Amino acid sequence: MALYEHIFLARQDISAQQVDALVEQYKGVIESFGGKVGRVENWGLKSLTYRIKKNRKAHYALMDIDAPAAAVHEVERQMRINEDVLRYMTIAVEAHEEGPSAMMQKRDRDDRPRRDGDRPDRGPREDRGPRPPREGGFGDREDRPRRPREDRA
C-alpha cells in the first residue's frame, strides 16, 4: 500500500462537528478498502487567498493515509460529488512526518523577528533630536499654499 497526505477544504458555513463527520466518512471509505488513516489534523477556519465558489474562508483538514490507490480514487470521487468540499489535494509521500504538521506548530515568540519598525542599532527618536526640515518641500499642511477649488458642473 502507498502512503499519502490528503488535505481538503470545506465550506465556511458548516460547523466544526460537520467537518469531523466528513473526516469520519472518508476514513470509513479508506478502511473499507483495507487502508488505514494515521494522523488527522483539523486546522480550523482560515482565510483563503482568493475566493473559491463564493467563499472567503474554509475549514482545513489533513489526513495521513496508508491505503491502496483505489481507496484514494474513491475518496476523491466522493469529495468531487460533495458540495461541502471546496478543494482537495492528495500527495504521495515516501514516509509520513512524525509529530504535528508545520501548520500546527507554534513558533516561539523569541524566534520571531522584531516588528517594531526601528532598527535595533538605534535608540528611540527622542535621543537623536528633531529632524531637520526638508529642503524645497513643504513640511506641514499649514505651510502649503491653498489649492484653488475647481467648480464642478
UniProtKB/Swiss-Prot annotation:
GO CC annotations, alphabetized: cytosolic small ribosomal subunit
Sequence segments annotated as region (Disordered): 94-153
UniProt entry keywords in alphabetical sequence: Ribonucleoprotein, Ribosomal protein, RNA-binding, rRNA-binding
GO biological process: translation
One MF term in the entry's GO annotations: structural constituent of ribosome
Pfam families the record matches: Ribosomal_S6
InterPro entries, sorted: Ribosomal_bS6 (IPR000529), Ribosomal_bS6_sf (IPR035980), Ribosomal_S6_plastid/chlpt (IPR020814), Transl_elong_EF1B/ribsomal_bS6 (IPR014717)
Superkingdom, taxonomy of origin: Bacteria
Family: Belongs to the bacterial ribosomal protein bS6 family.
Entry function: Binds together with bS18 to 16S ribosomal RNA.
Protein name per its UniProtKB record: Small ribosomal subunit protein bS6
Organism: Agrobacterium fabrum (strain C58 / ATCC 33970)
Gene responsible for this protein: rpsF
